[in-house]
Curated annotation (Swiss-Prot):
Keyword annotations of the record: Protein biosynthesis, Transferase
Taxonomic lineage from the root: Bacteria, Bacillati, Bacillota, Clostridia, Lachnospirales
Binding locations of (6S)-5,6,7,8-tetrahydrofolate: 109-112
Protein's job: Attaches a formyl group to the free amino group of methionyl-tRNA(fMet). The formyl group appears to play a dual role in the initiator identity of N-formylmethionyl-tRNA by promoting its recognition by IF2 and preventing the misappropriation of this tRNA by the elongation apparatus.
Species name: Lachnospira eligens (strain ATCC 27750 / DSM 3376 / VPI C15-48 / C15-B4) (Eubacterium eligens)
Superkingdom: Bacteria
InterPro entries named among the record's database cross-references: Fmt (IPR005794), Formyl_trans_C (IPR005793), Formyl_transf_N (IPR002376), Formyl_transf_N_sf (IPR036477), Formyl_transferase-like_C_sf (IPR011034), GART_AS (IPR001555), Met-tRNA-FMT_C (IPR044135), Met-tRNA-FMT_N (IPR041711)
SUPFAM superfamilies: FMT C-terminal domain-like, Formyltransferase
GO molecular function, one term: methionyl-tRNA formyltransferase activity
CDD domains assigned to the protein according to its UniProt record, in alphabetical order: FMT_core_Met-tRNA-FMT_N (cd08646), Met_tRNA_FMT_C (cd08704)
Family per similarity comment: Belongs to the Fmt family.
GO cellular component: cytosol
PROSITE patterns in the cross-refs: GART
Enzyme Commission code(s) on record: 2.1.2.9
Protein's UniProt name: Methionyl-tRNA formyltransferase
Length: 315
């Protein structure tokens, strides 16, 4: 097939590689404009652009994919299909309906659940048993197009947003190649989504990671995993941000009298861990990062910082 690929972040790179390796003709890659980064404000390529350049593929970077001039330029590539993976802009009907097989999107959830941004992190935060990848034929709605193929993935007990991201990126890559094969062979029957079963998730921001210890330890442990590596779960100690990278849940702590503790209070300090009271249960903290410092296990943190039972976190 003659393919135009539209994508921007790391998640999309694996799919682009898989399309190339499967022998499809990638006529062009469309990605977001280069972004200034760092103090020097030097322009940085998106991960997808890096991959396209490495393969000598033409790269297009429209400020607005809806602009008529870009739409007409895209038309000149005569694509059989446009593959869209985390591109970052909404597409007009003039692009969606342009190629013979339409625009095919790779979405990291089991649609119609978790439409929208950040479905990977939310699957972990919400404690889902399964996540997965859906390929769909795009329409003008937000992740509302007809379903083409689905692959489920069972989440591990200690799944993080980062580990699930990597797994679903790989799943999405091979599922998209299978989808292209099925479309070309005429063996796929698109299935309409059941809108009554749909859920939407919002984009994550750094502020979302602030831990509310009135919540249960189980909820907070999932938040920690879901926001690892970005934007990360955090609290404050003596006015400094303390990121919590790994923790376990404990229902009871034998040496603690429940009625004497408040949510957010450090209740035990051991050699290699410390424990925080929550609205329900306790968090046993295994790995942290104090503001301005590197990530470290809790034992290393406790050897370099004085922490005593009774200290309130979040202040």
């Amino acid at each position: 097939m003659r393919v135009v690929f539209m994508g921007t972040p790391d998640f999309a790179v694996g799919t682009l590689k898989a399309i190339i390796e499967a022998g499809h003709d990638v006529a062009a890659v469309v990605t977001q404009p280069d972004k200034p980064r760092g103090r020097s404000k030097s322009l940085v390529f998106s991960p997808v652009k890096d991959e396209a350049v490495a393969h000598g593929i033409t790269v297009l970077q429209p400020e607005r994919a809806r602009d008529e001039a870009f739409v007409e330029e895209l038309r000149t590539y005569n694509a059989d299909v446009i593959v869209v993976v985390a591109f970052g802009q909404l597409l007009p009907a003039s692009i969606i309906n342009m190629p013979r097989y339409g625009c095919i999107n790779v979405h990291a959830s089991l649609l119609p659940k978790y439409r929208g941004a950040s479905p990977i992190q939310w699957a972990v935060i919400d404690g889902c048993e399964y996540s997965g990848v859906t390929t769909m034929k795009m329409d003008e709605g937000l992740d509302t197009g007809d379903i083409l193929m689905v692959e489920k993935v069972k989440l591990d007990a200690k799944e993080t947003g980062g580990s699930l991201f990597d797994r679903l990126s790989d799943v999405g890559a091979h599922l998209l190649v299978k989808t292209l094969e099925g479309l070309e062979a005429g063996t796929i029957t698109p299935v309409k989504q059941d809108d009554s079963e749909s859920t939407y998730v919002k984009m994550l921001h750094k502020s979302f990671g602030k831990m509310d210890f009135n919540k249960s330890a189980a909820e907070l442990e999932r938040l920690i995993r879901g926001l690892n590596p970005w934007p990360s779960a955090f609290t404050y100690i003596d006015g400094k941000m303390l990121k919590i990278w790994d923790a376990d849940v404990a229902d009871n702590i034998s040496e603690v009298q429940t009625e004497e503790v408040k949510p957010g209070q450090v209740v035990t300090v051991g050699k290699n861990t410390f424990t925080i009271a929550c609205g329900q249960g306790y968090l046993v903290v295994n790995e942290v990062q104090l503001e301005g410092k590197k990530r470290m296990d809790s034992g290393s943190f406790l050897r370099g910082n004085q922490l005593e039972a009774g200290v309130m976190l979040g202040e």
